[in-house]
């Protein structure tokens, strides 16, 4: 697999199952602009409240066990992406049918046959970091995500971006700019002093 970033803006997504995993993945897709239909036997108050405040979320009450393969295919074919988060048996069935219809499919229990992953990720300022352990250790993925998130929060990304733009205007060679940025990034004291100067300049120009 190749890691990519994807906007779900305007994409139609079916989520089968409304347990903790199904809800979590549905929320991530909604945040990215996707149109999400959740298929489940029942829905809790949390997801019902979310539906009230989000026009891109629809809840369809249905028992997947009672559907034939043909009925499931008729549902799956309407969507761009499929997420199945019920149990291993049903997930395998949905993955198989989705693949037959050449759909992007994700499963909470099955990695074989799936062709898109929603990994653990964090976003701080303009930096997005994701980690995937191929389903072997979600706990490790979570701890790595938290570690990186804390590191990014302690690093002034906006300041580095500001300096980078300034260097582009004043230093023509990319290699020279890279050396300067590296020294700035590694020197905490210099970084703090530079941050104060930038803030002083910005305040004086507002």
UniProtKB/Swiss-Prot annotation:
GO annotation terms (biological process): siroheme biosynthetic process
Binding site for NAD(+): 20-21, 41-46
Molecular function in Gene Ontology: ferrochelatase activity; precorrin-2 dehydrogenase activity
Key word Ligase present: no
Pfam families: NAD_binding_7 (PF13241)
Pathway: Porphyrin-containing compound metabolism; siroheme biosynthesis; sirohydrochlorin from precorrin-2: step 1/1
Chemical reaction(s) catalysed: precorrin-2 + NAD(+) = sirohydrochlorin + NADH + 2 H(+)
Keyword Oxidoreductase listed: yes
Enzyme type, top EC level: oxidoreductase
Enzyme Commission code(s) on record: 1.3.1.76
Keywords: NAD, Oxidoreductase, Porphyrin biosynthesis
NCBIfam families in alphabetical order: cysG_Nterm
Assembly, per entry: Homodimer.
Job of this protein: Involved in the archaeal biosynthesis of heme. Catalyzes the oxiation of precorrin-2 into sirohydroclorin.
PANTHER family to which the protein is assigned, alphabetical: SIROHEME BIOSYNTHESIS PROTEIN MET8 (PTHR35330:SF1)
Family: Belongs to the precorrin-2 dehydrogenase / sirohydrochlorin ferrochelatase family.
Protein name: Putative precorrin-2 dehydrogenase
Source organism per UniProt: Methanocaldococcus jannaschii (strain ATCC 43067 / DSM 2661 / JAL-1 / JCM 10045 / NBRC 100440) (Methanococcus jannaschii)
